[in-house]
Regions:
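An amphipathic alpha-helix signature
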Residues: 4-8, 26, 30, 91
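Generic N-terminal amphipathic, Lys/Arg-enriched alpha-helix
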Residues: 1-15
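Alpha-helical segment that forms one wall of the substrate-binding/catalytic cleft
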Residues: 86-95
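His-Asp-centered metal-binding catalytic motifs of divalent-metal-dependent phosphohydrolases/nucleases
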Residues: 6, 42-77, 90, 108-114
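N-terminal alpha-helical segment
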Residues: 3-5, 87, 104
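Divalent metal-dependent phosphate-bond-processing catalytic cores, especially two-metal-ion Mg2+/Mn2+ enzymes
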Residues: 13-23, 27-38, 51-55, 62, ...
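Catalytic, metal-anchored helix/loop core of enzyme active sites in primary metabolism
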Residues: 82
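A generic structural signal for short
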Residues: 17, 78-79
Length: 198
């Protein structure tokens, strides 16, 4: 059994409620990487896609057991924001249990917050997670439609522009709901603006 098959076997064994979303991310990841980064292999994109929410439904105890076992530290925002835990615990499993390469692991790690200077696979998983077809939130649909329109126009910055738009919407939502915003998200947005992305 290769690594991708093992990840899928272990994932489906969890009886996840989110499996449709994860499958949607896998499908979108293939589409996005084929359009922008065809050098990324299908297996690489799929490993990252299937790992990204691998621990999403874990309990607090399960997350923190992983953090302790693998020496994963949380900053103040992460410690106070439960929705960020799964990215770090899934990263730990990707790296230490499944032995996936660093590119896949960082794509899993930053799929929720983004970061400045995201690498190709990180961009693929970040956007795939936001726009996959089962997402029905207004913001997700808006970014999905915007990305499709930019691609149709053959905009060379379609991917980065869609990511920037999603970051704007995420920050706005977090501000309006008075929740903490991770510094990586601000830095990801500012980096794209400095690169001239609109």
């Amino acid at each position: 059994m290769d690594k991708l098959e093992l990840i899928k076997y272990d994932l489906y064994a969890q009886d996840l409620r989110r499996i449709k979303h994860i499958e949607g991310v896998a499908e979108s990841a293939i589409e996005i990487k084929n359009r922008h980064f065809p050098f990324i292999t299908d297996e690489t994109a799929l490993c990252a896609a299937y790992m990204h929410d691998f621990t999403k439904e874990y309990s607090r105890e399960q997350h923190f057991a992983i953090f302790e076992r693998y020496g994963i530290e949380l900053d103040d925002c992460e410690a106070r924001t439960e929705k960020l835990w799964h990215a770090k615990s899934a990263y730990a499993l990707a790296k230490y249990v499944y032995g996936l390469d660093d590119g896949i692991c960082t794509a899993v790690l930053y799929h929720t917050t983004g970061r400045a200077g995201m690498q190709p696979l990180e961009k693929v998983i970040y956007l795939a997670d936001y726009i996959e077809k089962t997402r029905t939130f207004v913001d997700c649909v808006d970014v999905r439609d915007t990305y499709a329109m930019l691609c149709e126009k053959r905009d060379k910055n379609a991917l980065d522009s869609a990511i920037l738009y999603s970051l704007d919407l995420t920050i706005t939502d977090l501000l309006e709901s008075r929740r903490m915003i991770h510094k990586n998200t601000f830095e990801a947005r500012n980096y794209l603006l400095k690169e001239g992305i609109e």
